[in-house]
């Protein structure tokens, strides 16, 4: 947080901290699931800022849970070992050989690196995966390409979440860092899209919020038209435009939609290229990204006059 306000005057600093108070009160003892991805995973300064954000949330009483993918790192390792990477319908084609790399990179590299960064602040983070204690159960996913169901290998969808062991980690005051690989009932291990996994997990554990880090400012309804950026959208509105979105954004917005329809109070798509973007979205009036709301949103738990988004008037949504 110091990085956010170090260049501000004393009065402005005080106002920034005071502005965060209702949000700090609201998120105390609440679970916040954060999907870690994009530039925040590859830029050293952004990685450090993200880790600090998770510790900040934990220190003020929230219960952060991190779900991560590892696309750039997987692609780099595939190139190093001479394996061809291929995508179909926005998903990585995952042969058994590619799956070995995915498994190694997600849990053995990306997850361990993030656990280490968080634990540089104290003994907070615990690495785990969808394989551990039956957290996720998956089934094979077929991708629709030009109307044709297409086999993309060991890519799965989550069909069950057993979060009992994960809740033990959370209730012990730790920060779970979840790698998105999962066993299927057929005995295979599947590569799970991290956006999809984060949304499913958030709904299953009764999270208050889901945040998805991206490399853009939020949801553009007509990418790349910058004027089409929206600061908030309700579930039915999102569902209507989902098929026409940019292919890279569809899994992220689908995850948000499923989360809010699964009981999560709101989901957020935020720009992971901004240091401390998680804190800026959760703890400042108006936020910085796009907020996805259920069709009926209960404001009674928030102080009167709370401004959720920058273009709200009198706190209305």
UniProtKB/Swiss-Prot annotation:
It catalyses: N-acetyl-L-glutamate + ATP = N-acetyl-L-glutamyl 5-phosphate + ADP. Pathway: Amino-acid biosynthesis; L-arginine biosynthesis; N(2)-acetyl-L-ornithine from L-glutamate: step 2/4. Its EC number is 2.7.2.8. GO terms for molecular function: acetylglutamate kinase activity; ATP binding. One of its GO terms (cellular component) is cytoplasm. It is found in: Cytoplasm. It is an enzyme of class 2 (transferase). The record marks 35, 252 as: Transition state stabilizer. HAMAP family: ArgB. Catalyzes the ATP-dependent phosphorylation of N-acetyl-L-glutamate. Belongs to the acetylglutamate kinase family. ArgB subfamily. PANTHER family: N-ACETYLGLUTAMATE SYNTHASE, N-ACETYLGLUTAMATE SYNTHASE, MITOCHONDRIAL. This is Acetylglutamate kinase. It comes from Corynebacterium glutamicum (strain R).
């Amino acid at each position: 947080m110091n990085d956010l306000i170090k260049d501000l005057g004393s009065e402005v600093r005080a106002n920034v901290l005071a502005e965060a108070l209702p949000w700090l009160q609201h998120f105390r003892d609440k679970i916040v699931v954060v999907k870690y991805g994009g530039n925040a995973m590859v830029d050293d300064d952004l990685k450090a800022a993200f880790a600090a954000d998770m510790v900040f949330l934990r220190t003020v009483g929230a219960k952060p849970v991190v779900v991560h993918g590892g696309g750039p790192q997987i692609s780099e390792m595939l190139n190093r070992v001479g394996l061809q990477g291929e995508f179909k319908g926005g998903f990585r084609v995952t042969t058994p050989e590619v799956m070995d790399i995915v498994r190694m990179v997600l849990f053995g590299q990306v997850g361990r690196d993030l656990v280490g960064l968080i634990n540089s602040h104290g003994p907070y983070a615990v690495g785990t995966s969808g394989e551990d204690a039956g957290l996720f159960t998956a089934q094979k996913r077929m991708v629709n390409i030009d109307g044709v169901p297409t086999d993309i290998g060991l890519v799965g969808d989550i069909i069950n979440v057993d979060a009992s062991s994960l809740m033990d980690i959370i209730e012990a005051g730790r920060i779970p860092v979840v790698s998105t690989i999962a066993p299927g009932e057929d005995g295979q291990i599947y590569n799970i899209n991290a956006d999809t996994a984060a949304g499913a997990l958030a709904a299953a554990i009764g999270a208050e919020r889901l945040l998805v880090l991206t490399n853009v400012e939020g949801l553009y309804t007509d990418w790349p038209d910058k004027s089409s950026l929206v600061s908030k959208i309700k579930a039915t509105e999102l569902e209507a435009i989902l098929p026409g979105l940019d292919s890279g954004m569809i899994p992220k917005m689908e995850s948000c939609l499923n989360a809010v329809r699964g009981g999560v109070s709101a989901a957020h798509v935020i720009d992971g290229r901004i240091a401390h973007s998680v804190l800026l979205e959760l703890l400042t009036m108006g936020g910085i990204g796009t907020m996805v709301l259920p069709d009926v949103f209960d404001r009674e738990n928030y102080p009167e006059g709370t401004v959720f988004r920058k273009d709200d008037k009198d706190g209305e949504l």
